[in-house]
Regions:
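Active-site mouth of glycoside hydrolases
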Residues: 30-296, 304-329, 335-428
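Accessible peptide chain termini
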Residues: 1-2, 429
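C-terminal motif of bacterial Sec signal peptides marking the signal peptidase cleavage site
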Residues: 23-24
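Bacterial N-terminal signal peptides that target proteins for export
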Residues: 3-14
Length: 429
C-alpha cells in the first residue's frame, strides 16, 4: 500500500471514528450537527416548522393564558407535521406599552412573572408529549417584546423609543447604544443565566436536559445598527459572551444567533461571517421579508411575487455558500408574505403567498435544512386590526396588522405546507 493510500485510509478511519463518538454522545431526541448536517437519533434531519411566539403565554394559567386553545393548536400542528416551533421566551418591561406584547415575563431586571415561567415550563411539557421541539429566543432588537430598548432603559434611564411613534431611524440610532452598554448587557446576561439554567417546575427536569428544546437563540434579529467599528466590536462581543454563557450552562442543545443574514448585518459579508463564526454557534439562520425589503409591491403582490422569488433564490443560494464554508446547516427560520390585496382580513385569499411559500419549501433538503414560516395564527379570531390587550394572540405581534402575515387553519396555505412536508427531502417524522 502506498503512503498516500495509507494516509487516505487513516483519514477515513478517524473520520468514521469521530462520527461514531458523536453519535454515542448524543442523547436520544437531541439534534446535533455533523459535517454541516442536522442529525437526530443517528439520522439526517430536516424540517418545516413555524413561528409561534405566543406559545408560552397560552400555556400559562394567568392573563392571556388559554390552555384549551394551546392544546388545540399543538394537536393541529403535530398532525400537520409542523413540529419545530420558533418561540419567544418572554417579553421584557412593563405592560401597557404601545405595540409591545403582553403580559410580560421579566417585569424588572431579574424579576419575573412566575405564572408565565410556569407557562414556559408547561409549554415545553406539551411539546415533549407530541415529540415537538422549540427554538427559544432570549432577546429582541425590535420593540415588540422589549429587548434592546428595555435593557437600555433599565440601565440608563433613557426612555426606549417606539418606532411607530418616533420613526425607525431615531429608534435604530438609540438601539445601537446597546452594543456598547456594559450595564445593559450585564442585565441581559443575568436573564440568560436564569432561563437557560432553569429547572422545569412541573417535571423537575433541567432545561438543559429537555429534548423538547431544539436550540437556544441569542435573540430575534439581533442587529448592530451601525457601521462604526467600535460599535460592531461591541456587538460581536456581547453575542460572543452570550454564546459562552449558554454553552457553559447547556452543552446538550444547539445554539444559533437569530440573525437575518446580510439584511441584518448592514449588508456586510464580513460582519455576517463574524457573526456566524462566534464560538458555540452551531447553525446559520436567515430571515426573508419580500414586502419589507421592497422585493414585492403591496399594490400588486400577485404581479410581483415572481420577482420576490428570484430575489429570494439569490439570497438563499448566497447564504448557503457561506454556511457550507463555515460547516453550518442553514435555516430560513422566518419568512413571510402578505395576504392578497395586502389585506389583514382573515377571509382574504393567499394566492401570491402560496406561490412564494412553495418556492421556499422546495429549498428544504437542497440549500436549506429547515424553514419556519411567520407565523402561526391557527384558530385565532382577531378582534382588531391593531392588537389590543385582551385580544386573541395570532402570528402577527402587537406592532403588526393582525392577520396580514399570519397563517390560519382555514388558509389554502395549509394544504401546500402539508404537501411540502410530505415531499421534503430526508424529513424526519
Amino acid at each position: 500500500m502506498s503512503a498516500n493510500i495509507m494516509k487516505y485510509s487513516l483519514k477515513l478511519f478517524f473520520a468514521g471514528l469521530s462520527s461514531l463518538i458523536l453519535l454515542s454522545c448524543a442523547k436520544p431526541g437531541f439534534v446535533t450537527v455533523e459535517n454541516g448536517q442536522f442529525v437526530r437519533d443517528g439520522k439526517p434531519f430536516t424540517y418545516i416548522g413555524t413561528n409561534f411566539w405566543y406559545g408560552p403565554i397560552l400555556a400559562s394559567e394567568g392573563r392571556g393564558g388559554d390552555i384549551d386553545r394551546l392544546t388545540r393548536e399543538l394537536d393541529y400542528l403535530q398532525a400537520a407535521g409542523l413540529r419545530n416551533l420558533r418561540v419567544l421566551v418572554g417579553a421584557d418591561g412593563a405592560d401597557g406599552v404601545f405595540s409591545r406584547v403582553e403580559p410580560t415575563l421579566q417585569t424588572a431586571p431579574g424579576v419575573y412573572n412566575d405564572t408565565l415561567l410556569v407557562g414556559l415550563d408547561r409549554f415545553l411539557v406539551e411539546l415533549g408529549k407530541r415529540d415537538m421541539q422549540a427554538v427559544l429566543y432570549l432577546n429582541n432588537s425590535w420593540e415588540w417584546s422589549g429587548g434592546y430598548g428595555q435593557y437600555l432603559e433599565w440601565a440608563t434611564g433613557e426612555k426606549a423609543l417606539i418606532p411607530l411613534e418616533a420613526g425607525y431611524w431615531p429608534f435604530m440610532q438609540q438601539m445601537r447604544k446597546f452594543q456598547t452598554s456594559a450595564e445593559s448587557q450585564e442585565l441581559f446576561y443575568n436573564h440568560v443565566k436564569a432561563i437557560v439554567g432553569r429547572t422545569n417546575s412541573i417535571t423537575g427536569k433541567a432545561y438543559a436536559d429537555d429534548p423538547a428544546i431544539f436550540a437556544w437563540q441569542i435573540g430575534n434579529e439581533p442587529r448592530c445598527f451601525s457601521d462604526d467599528p467600535a460599535v460592531r466590536d461591541g456587538f460581536i462581543g456581547w453575542m460572543t459572551q452570550t454564546a459562552r454563557i449558554i454553552k457553559e450552562i447547556d452543552r446538550n442543545h444547539l445554539l444559533s444567533t437569530g440573525n437575518e443574514g446580510l439584511m441584518g448585518s448592514e449588508n456586510d459579508p464580513d460582519l455576517l461571517r463574524r457573526i456566524n463564526s462566534i464560538p458555540g454557534v452551531d447553525y446559520m439562520t436567515i430571515h426573508i421579508w419580500p414586502y419589507n425589503w421592497t422585493w414585492a409591491d403591496p399594490a400588486d403582490l400577485e404581479g410581483t411575487v415572481n420577482d420576490a422569488i428570484d430575489r429570494t433564490e439569490e439570497y438563499i443560494i448566497g447564504h448557503a455558500k457561506m454556511a457550507r464554508e463555515l460547516g453550518h446547516p442553514l435555516v430560513c427560520e422566518e419568512f413571510g408574505f402578505p395576504r392578497d390585496g395586502f389585506s389583514p382580513q382573515r377571509t382574504a385569499t393567499t394566492r401570491a403567498r402560496d406561490r412564494y411559500y412553495k418556492y421556499v419549501f422546495s429549498q428544504v433538503g437542497v440549500n436549506l435544512q429547515g424553514a419556519n414560516f411567520w407565523g402561526w395564527s391557527g384558530f385565532a379570531q382577531p378582534l382588531h386590526e391593531q392588537w389590543q390587550s385582551g385580544d386573541p394572540y395570532a402570528g402577527d405581534p402587537a406592532q403588526e396588522a393582525q392577520g396580514l402575515n399570519g397563517v390560519y387553519v382555514t388558509d389554502t396555505t395549509l394544504d401546500l405546507i402539508v404537501n411540502a412536508i410530505n415531499n421534503s427531502h430526508n424529513y424526519n417524522n
